[in-house]
Amino acid sequence: MGQYLTKTEESSLNYVDLPDTVHRKIFEYLNPWEIFKLSRISKAIHVTILKNKKFAVKDIDLCTDENILKFQFQFVNNIVLSWEFYNLHEKPYFTSQFSNRCQYRQQYDIKNYYENPEEAFLFAFRNALSIFNVQNSKLKRFYLAPSKLELFFKLPYSFIDGRNCENLSIWNKKANDEDERDFSINFAKAVLEKMGVVRNLRLLFNCSTKDNEFDCEKEYYNSETDKLMPNDWYLYNKFDDIDLNVFLKNWLNFRDPLIRKFRIRGKRNFNTAIIFDGIETIPWDQRNGLNVYYYSATANDTGSLIFQANENHAIVKVGAINGNESSGYMEFLFITF
């Protein structure tokens, strides 16, 4: 008959007092989610885990949107651990509450509710940074909304300050007045000043002027070594056809390699005679084989202009509307080499 270890003052096993060699052996049988849960049992166990970090993080994704707060760790063995704090908008009686999901190979799905989801998000993120090896990790994707300005500055300074980011997206879907636009661009500048090198930057704002309403999206591509600080021109501009003509001429003359994609969609048609005035273009067909981004118009879509560039050419696609129906695209090629 086997013997059983009962939990008494004399016989209980104190995990913390075990030698580090035993700790490391135990950790070999635990996955990241189990390590995370174990770290929350006591401060002493948390310290033990800090001294024996087993899992190295390869990529980190962060999202601080209006309705979702999320961080995701991808480890060197391709295991993914993610936490999501999101607004349960599909259940009206939970509108002000958030749920979190922590997943390890889709095996775990836990739900809790928090009065302060931002504090819960920060607590979980700080804890994950401390117990896993993030020294050589990359910040792969970072999605930010200007309304989360205070949350951004509460992120661990040692993690954010000077850290390189491969893909940074900042958007504001409510920038429909001058104050909102000013706030959004100042937020973008504040983020870029704290970050290190940003490889790809995507800025998206809904804008309106006296004569027009439009979505504005601009994407930059940066080198590995330079700071990326875009100007304010695209945000404060009303983007009539003359402005777009000036933009294209400036790009052709100065060959700014940072601008890779520029798209606006407005509740109007674009006059290509004005937009391309003084610019030599070649009619282009996507079947000619250039690998570029294409935007598919829908029946309810508005007019749009897409500028897509690389080092030696650019393509401009102008979409037209006829009532509520899309009339398709005209495509123009600029050869710059």
UniProtKB/Swiss-Prot annotation:
Keyword entries, A-Z: Ubl conjugation pathway
The F-box domain, residue ranges: 12-60
Domain of life where this protein originates: Eukaryota
Species for this entry: Caenorhabditis elegans
Descriptive protein name: Uncharacterized F-box protein C05B5.5
PROSITE patterns documented for this protein: FBOX
InterPro entries listed in its UniProt record: F-box_dom
A Pfam cross-reference name: F-box
